[in-house]
From Swiss-Prot:
Subcellular location: Cytoplasm; Nucleus
Gene it is expressed from: med15
Name of the featured protein: Mediator of RNA polymerase II transcription subunit 15
InterPro entries with a match to the protein in the record: KIX_dom_sf, Med15_C, Med15_central, Med15_N
Organism: Danio rerio
Segments passing through the bilayer: none
Biased composition regions of type Polar residues, renumbered to the chain: 533-549
Ranges of compositional bias, category Gly residues: 119-128
Length: 809
């Protein structure tokens, strides 16, 4: 039979049809009539079988039964009954088989050339397909074959002759079936060995594949880590590059600013040089105009005596002496001419002196200007050095920021600050207050009474204006006035013979102080004083001065409202669990937050509204009336004033007495000793006669009764106790101590509130040194007792003094 496929294929219709065809062929070869068809027989076997092996074994037995019928050519019993009554003792037919063994003798049936070979081949194919399933099926097959011998019986009674006939018919083929079974077992064992080897190879292959897969996964993880590291390095490089680019851009901007500052300084130096040249030219022009005026005066004087032709004296610049010689020698008149020449000489001398003084002043001014320029250059160099230092610090800060950013980027998942969002710290501006007072122009500009017009920051050339200059004798317009200089850079007024007038074409220019500052200021300012610089306190209004009064009012109001803090807290605790007043609770909490939290600041108007709301809630909160404001005491505060204040504040507290006792009782006990209490007073009432006769207090009687037997106490008969005081005589009767004089005690009427008194009689203890020692010890030990002590304590002290004297002796 051809049995392809796994264990579940034996239930398929195709497989069952093949089995029906084989049964039909066996029935046809048997040649005898049967009551049932091959399909019915196969369906009966199919319903009885539970596994493939059981199904095949039952079909094989059925086919063997038909073959035996064919051999005997006799009518046998019903094949179904024969199938049910086959004995199980025949080896190799129904009995238990070893694992992997198949039905023997199936290859010998005349069912076709490839009938039973197909069964074996199908089983081999099935074994090759599932070796693990074959092992399980073989184990199940043994159990099922044992059960088949007992369970598969359709009819329990059959003739013994038929059974014997079938046994005899089956015996010839039993030996051959055993041989065939052994061959099949060996073949099946070989197949199992091959399958085991294949399984081992497959397991090894799977292990190798798993190892390869693991190595691939590790390689992929390493590649991902390398990619992440490369990305982080690229990002860090980009951050570094951006930071370096920013630093370079800032350095370039600073270099450009320095170059501009140097260019401005050079331009200012050129302007100053031009101004000096202009000043010299103006001085020369003034000298020429003065000479021309002198010549005109001389010509006028000469014209009065003798008419002469006037030459162009202003065109030639010659000394006054040579001009006098050229004009006065050929045209001299007696009397008037000599006087006029003398006057002209005096005027010339004065003019020469004035010119010399003017030249000296100009030289001094030039020297001062040069010194100022040198100072300005030094200041510029210092500022450049400071800027370089600031640049270096700024670059260091940027490098630190870049390092921090790189550290942040090294951790995945964190937010990385964008380099473009970083605002570089502004360089501290050079305070122009240090440079403006050094500029003489600014000081001069503020002190000039004539310059009332608005002008730009004046240049150092304006220092010439406030100086005094002797006016010419006759202020007349000169024939050659100083023309307007278009190339003049001076912004201040230039001196002219006609008075101090500004130049016709003043051009505003920046002063050195303004060029040094990195911030450009508005041009039209009256003086450098009100410039809005950080260092000028007059230009920037202090916010502290403006809000000082408001802060003071706010703090005073907050101090006034501090009395509502505790009542407000009690009110909040009271309505905290009341759900109906949640809104009021939130408002009260906000009010309490405003009053208690110093960081919470609200406007003064809001605080006033809070005061109104608290006044409305005053009755509900039961705010205590504030005490009158304390009078400022200039005297020294009393030492115990804090304790008195605390007592006054807590005097009405129900636990105040307990707190005082708990606080001060240990100290009072250490100072005054333990409280002396007498025995409890009996409940029964004494008779009046007993009270009148009783002269000694009960406390004292009880204490004397409890004394040690070594103390003998008696009343002193020499004293009467009319005033309530009790006098006692105490003796020491101790076998271990020597005899000493008795002790006389006086107990006050209010004992134990007052301590007993020892009536010291020094004469009794002056008899010998031993008694003097006892007296000394007694006196010193009494000082160590508390101010309130009992009779027992006093007597014990006396005994200790005697014992101490004995030890010292």
């Amino acid at each position: 039979m051809d049995v392809p496929g796994p264990d579940s294929d034996w239930r398929s219709p195709a497989f069952r049809q093949k089995v029906v065809a084989q049964i039909e062929e066996a029935m046809r070869k048997a040649g005898t009539g049967h009551t049932k068809s091959s399909t019915e027989m196969e369906s009966h076997v199919f319903t009885k079988a539970k596994t493939r092996e059981e199904y095949l074994s039952m079909v094989a037995r059925l086919i063997i039964h038909f073959r035996d019928i064919h051999k005997k050519a006799q009518g046998g019993p019903d094949p179904i009954n024969a199938l049910q009554n086959l004995p199980g003792g025949v080896p190799g037919v129904i009995g238990p088989r070893p694992p992997g063994a198949q039905m023997g003798g199936m290859g010998q049936m005349s069912m076709g050339p490839h009938a039973m070979q197909g069964v074996a081949g199908g089983q081999q194919g099935a074994g090759a397909a599932g070796p693990m399933q074959q092992m399980i099926q073989q184990q199940q097959q043994q159990q099922q074959q044992q059960q088949q011998q007992q369970s598969i019986q359709f009819q329990t009674f059959q003739p013994q002759q038929q059974q014997q006939a079938t046994m005899q018919s089956q015996q010839p083929s039993a030996m051959f079936q055993q041989i065939r079974l052994q061959q099949l077992q060996q073949h099946h064992q070989n197949q199992q060995m091959q399958h085991q080897n294949q399984q081992q190879q497959q397991a090894q292959n799977q292990q190798q594949q798993n190892q390869l897969h693991q190595t691939r996964m590790q390689q992929q993880l390493q590649l991902q880590q390398l990619q992440q590291q490369q990305q982080q390095q690229l990002h860090q490089q980009q951050v570094h590059a951006q930071a370096q680019a920013q630093a370079q851009a800032q350095a370039q901007a600073q270099a450009q600013a320095q170059a501009q500052a140097q260019a401005q300084a050079q331009a200012q130096a050129q302007a100053q040089a031009q101004a000096q040249a202009q000043a010299q030219a103006q001085a020369q022009a003034q000298a020429q105009s003065i000479q021309q005026m002198q010549q005109q005066q001389q010509l006028q004087v000469q014209a009065q005596g003798q008419p002469q032709v006037q030459g162009q004296g202003g065109a030639v610049q010659m000394p006054p002496h040579s001009q006098q010689q050229q004009v006065l020698v050929p045209q001299m008149v007696q009397g008037q001419h000599s006087q006029m020449s003398a006057l002209s000489q005096q005027q010339q001398l004065k003019l020469q002196q004035a010119m010399q003084a003017r030249m000296q002043q100009q030289q001094q001014q030039q020297q001062q200007q040069q010194q100022q320029q040198q100072q300005q250059q030094q200041q510029q160099q210092q500022q450049q050095q400071q800027q370089q230092q600031q640049q270096q610090q700024h670059q260091q800060q940027q490098v630190q920021q870049v390092q921090q950013a790189s550290q942040l980027t090294a951790v995945p998942g964190q937010m990385m600050p964008r380099p473009g969002m970083q605002i570089p710290p502004r360089l501290p501006r050079a305070t122009p207050n240090s440079a403006i007072p050094q500029n003489p122009v600014a000081i001069g500009g503020q002190q000039m009474p004539q310059a009332q017009q608005m002008m730009s920051s004046p240049s150092p050339v304006q220092v010439q204006t406030p100086q005094s200059m002797p006016p010419p004798p006759q202020p007349q317009p000169s024939p050659q006035p100083p023309s307007s200089q278009p190339n003049s850079v001076s912004s201040g007024p230039t001196p002219s013979p006609g008075g101090f007038q500004p130049s016709p074409s003043p051009q505003p220019s920046q002063s050195p102080a303004s060029s040094r500052t990195p911030q450009s200021y508005p041009l039209q300012v009256p003086s450098p004083g009100p410039l809005n610089t950080p260092g000028n306190p007059s230009s920037v209004m202090s916010p502290a001065g403006a809000s000082q009064s408001e802060d003071q009012l706010y703090m005073d109001k907050l101090r006034q409202l501090s009395k509502y803090i505790e009542p407000l807290r009690r009110m909040i605790n009271k309505i905290d669990k009341n759900e109906d007043r949640k809104k009021d609770l939130s408002k009260m909490k906000s009010l309490l937050n405003i009053l208690t939290d110093p960081n919470t600041r609200c406007p003064l108007k809001t605080l006033q509204k809070c005061e109104i709301a608290l006044e409305k809630l005053k009755n509900d909160m039961a705010v205590p009336t504030p005490p009158p404001p304390p009078v400022p005491c200039t005297k020294k505060q009393y030492l115990c004033q804090p304790i008195l204040d605390a007592v006054l504040a807590n005097i009405r507290s129900p636990v105040f007495n307990h707190s005082l006792y708990r606080t001060f009782a240990p100290a009072m006990t250490a100072i005054h000793g333990p409280q002396i209490t007498g025995p409890s007073i009996p409940s029964r009432k004494r008779k009046l006669e007993d009270d009148e006769r009783q002269a000694i207090p009960n406390i004292l009687q009880g204490e004397v009764a409890r004394l040690n037997s070594k103390f003998l106490v008696n009343l002193d008969p020499s004293f009467c106790s009319n005033n309530g005081m009790v006098h006692l005589i105490c003796k020491l009767d101790d076998k271990n101590l020597p005899s000493v004089p008795p002790l006389q005690l006086s107990i006050p009427a209010d004992y134990p509130d007052q301590s007993p008194h020892w009536e010291d009689d020094g004469q009794q203890y002056e008899a010998n040194p031993f008694l003097r020692t006892v007296h000394k010890n007694m006196t010193s030990k009494l000082l160590q007792l508390p101010d309130k002590h009992s009779v027992t304590a006093l007597l014990n002290t006396w005994a200790q003094s005697v014992r101490q004297a004995c030890l010292s002796a």
